[in-house]
Every structure is written in structure tokens, then in C-alpha cells.
Amino acid sequence: MATKRSVGTLKEADLKGKSVFVRVDLNVPLDDNSNITDDTRIRAAVPTIKYLMGNGSRVVLCSHLGRPKGVTPKYSLKPLVPRLSELLGVEVVMANDSIGEEVQKLVAGLPEGGVLLLENVRFYAEEEKNDPEFAKKLAALADVYVNDAFGTAHRAHASTEGVAKFLKPSVAGFLMQKELDYLVGAVANPKKPFAAIVGGSKVSTKIGVIESLLNTVDILLLGGGMIFTFYKAQGLSVGSSLVEEDKLDLAKSLMEKAKAKGVSLLLPTDVVIADKFAPDANSKIVPATAIPDGWMGLDIGPDSIKTFSEALDTTKTIIWNGPMGVFEFDKFAAGTEAVAKQLAELSGKGVTTIIGGGDSVAAVEKVGLADKMSHISTGGGASLELLEGKPLPGVLALDEA
């Protein structure tokens, strides 16, 4: 993907007095009383918004929340206004809609440096259909388009892709820029040796990532539930562990591919097994070759942690996507936590550490090491598709640098 123009190239002359439509990702978790339980995504959007405010723009923020079918009050963005106002240091104005005359009046009434939050853009089915008429109505609110919502960049929706056709310039926000620099940069031009750690429960969701990474990595470490499909493909007995029977041939071919490309593919040599899938299950450590019937593997074992650790010590760039075990249960979190701690330590020694979205982000946050990593991706699906080498519609729509 070509390099895209960044919001940082727009100066006061380009921005003062202009309305700027900013697609942000404010899809934060709310509890039953509409309190924000994790404001990471809101905080991540602040640098771009503050830059635009500081240059005298009228900022129009657009986001989705959840997957509403039509107008659904529980998916309103209103509960986000107090936190957003607090972080930005201005009183954010809330619109009751995302298009139309009323909204246009609110935009016109904003002072320079003022901020308006549109209501959930997915209240309109046209958003996800990328309806050009709807995109035009969104574009009618502004002069400039900034996409800072990396988490939805893999979707061609009206607010992420369609609107860019009607507004020039269309540029990447600072968060989007950082995501692209790290994720595209790591895959296209990593400092070697380059390792990828891929975990998670299913091989099927990570096939594309593994295949793509086999072209660039020197070392590939596999963990999580997917390892049992690889074990079974090698003829090992896996007890009651999770296996994707229809992916056994694929697992074999991935191991052969790694060998042919000279990639060091490491599978755990020991596992922590449990007699049931529960936080209070009985557990024991066994070699990967000796999983008894009726037991299931829920984490990688201490020998594997040591082997993985020694392999990672040799590297200069590491991408991590997916946990090593069922880290939600404390008893089976040791593997994932050990990887998080080691990556934090290596970051301190100058290794580039990239946490590629999804559950690994939650794992790193659980251990309290998020701020120690070089880059934590805010996108789940978008990070995966980028690592798979797929073009992202929300990025392609932006102006070339």
C-alpha cells in the first residue's frame, strides 16, 4: 500500500475556520448503566482532535458504537460526551443525528476549535452499505476529511470510504498513521531477526496471517488452542483439546512451508492440561507428546516458555497476535503473561515490539505492561487483514502522500 498523506501535513492555513469531518473509533465498552468501562479508544483519538482544534478547525466527530439495527438508544454516543469533553478540555456539543439540516446548523454554530459529536453513524443502514447518497450527506457537513479510525479501516463503509470521494483533502489521522507505520513497516521492512508469535484458539482465523508472515519472519512461535491441530497433524494424541479436524492437512502444509522457507517454527514442547474448561479445573503439566485422554490443554508449559524466551532474545522485531492460553482463567495465564513480560523487557533493550490487536492487547493490559510496548494496535480485524497483506478500503480512499 502506498504511503498516505497525514493530517500533520495540513497547517493552520489549510485548517483555520474549516469544518473537518473526522472518522474516529469511539466503539468503547459500556456497562449496564452506560458508564465507560475502558476509555482506551477515546484517549487514542485525542491527539488528532487536539491538533485540529489547535489549528482553528471546527471539528465534526463521527463514530459507530456496537452493531445497532436502526436507531437503538442503548447504542447512543451521548454517554461518551462527558469523558470526551474532559480529555479535550472543551464542552463537546452532541448532535441527535449524523446528517441533515439540524446537524448542519450545529456545525455552522461551532466556534473555531469547537467540537461536535455526531450520533451513532450506524443508526443508518446506509452506513454499512456504503451508500453514495448517504456518504454525500455526511460530506456536506465539512470541507476536509480525516480518517483516524484504524479499527474500521478494513470496512468499506460510507464514513470510512465513501465520504473520501466527496472531500479533498482526505488524510490519515495520527493514530491511523502510527498503525500503518508500524504494521506495514514491520511486514515490509522489519529489522531482522524478525519473530512472530501467533496464538488464539483457532488456526482457521489465523491462516492468512501465518501464510503471509512465513514470507518475512525468521522465527514463528505458535501457542494457544490452535497448537492441538498442529499436534494432531503430526500424529500426536491431544485428549479432549480443541482440534479443527478439517484443518489437519493445512497445518501439515504450513509446517512444510516453514521448513522450505527456512523459518524456525516452534511449537510448545509441554502444555498445562485441565480436566475441564473452568477456572477451578484440576491441572497438571505434561509433555506435548503425553496428553492423556479426557484432559485438555489450556496453556503452554514452563519448558516452552523458556524455549520461546531464548528464541525471542535473539530478535530485533516481534509481532504478537493472540494469547498462549486461556489467560482469562488465572490458572492458565502463565504462558501469556510470560510472553508479555518478556516483550516489555525486550522493548526496553531497543527491540521493536508490536502487539497486533485483539486478545493480545487485553492480555498486555491485564499484566499492566501496555505502555512498555513499541506499538499496541487498536484494530482487531483491521490489524489481521493488514498483516495478511490485504489492502484496507479505508486507507486506499485517502490521498497519496
Curated annotation (Swiss-Prot):
It is found in: Cytoplasm. Keywords: ATP-binding, Cytoplasm, Glycolysis, Kinase, Magnesium, Metal-binding, Nucleotide-binding, Transferase. One of its GO terms (molecular function) is metal ion binding. ADP binds at G200, G224, F327. Coiled coil: none annotated. (2R)-3-phosphoglycerate binds at V24, D25, N27, R41, S63, H64, G66, R67, R122, H154, R155. InterPro entries: Phosphoglycerate_kinase, Phosphoglycerate_kinase_N, Phosphoglycerate_kinase_sf. Its EC number is 2.7.2.3. GO terms for biological process: glycolytic process; response to glucose; response to heat; response to light stimulus; response to molecule of bacterial origin. Pathway: Carbohydrate degradation; glycolysis; pyruvate from D-glyceraldehyde 3-phosphate: step 2/5. AMP binds at K202, K206, G225, G297, E328. This is Phosphoglycerate kinase 3, cytosolic. It comes from Arabidopsis thaliana (Mouse-ear cress).
